[in-house]
Amino acid sequence: EDTRVSLKLLNHLELKKSLVSYHEHNKAESGEKILARLLAGETCALVTDAGSPAISDPGEDLVRLCAEHGVTVCAIPGPCALVTALSISGLPTGRFTFEGFLSVNKKSRQEHLTGLKDETRTMIFYEAPHKLLATLRDLTAAFGEDRRISLCRELTKLHEEVRRMTLGEASAY
């Protein structure tokens, strides 16, 4: 995504590597360039600014492109916000569904939530901080104010925060 973020880590480790930015706005062009280099025998590492590459992340499309062209993709397990959040949520972990980021289009978002109305598994959503309150209101409208939730942010970082409450309490928080 933003090469400056990865560059900090590479510089700290004193690694000199060529970086190619790959994000939502350049993925068609950058994806083809990266694929051409891989097909020519080069290797690369897919990293992301935060979280796990390809999980609610533009890297998902790059992995798909590689798979379509027979390029082997290997995962190196590491931190994953959704599993980390689930493990400390206090909610049932036996069965869950990951919904990623909801659509910014209000109608699409409401249709998606309506389709989940009867879902009994723990549901995991990602949301940007500046959209959280509106999303909590939409979730409350879809699932009712008594549904238990866990709000997790800055996981594994200095300012980690986990709040466990109902949707009604969260909307008023």
Which residues are covered by each model-predicted region?
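Short, well-ordered secondary-structure micro-motifs
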Residues: E32, D57, A85-S87, R109-E111, ...
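Class I SAM-dependent methyltransferase SAM-binding "motif I" and its flanking Rossmann-like core
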Residues: D61-E119
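Short, hinge-like loop/turn segments at secondary-structure boundaries
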Residues: L15-K17, A36-L38, V63-R64, S89-G94, ...
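Short hydrophobic/aromatic-enriched beta-strand-loop microsegments
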Residues: K16-H23, V73-C74, G94-G100, D146-C152
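Class I S-adenosyl-L-methionine
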Residues: E1-I76, T84
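Generic beta-sheet signal
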Residues: A40-T48, F96, R121-F125
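A contiguous loop/helix-start segment that scaffolds small-molecule binding in enzyme catalytic cores
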Residues: T43, T122, Y126-Y173
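Short, acidic/turn-prone active-site loops that include or flank metal/cofactor-
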Residues: T3-R4, S21-K27, P79, G100-N105, ...
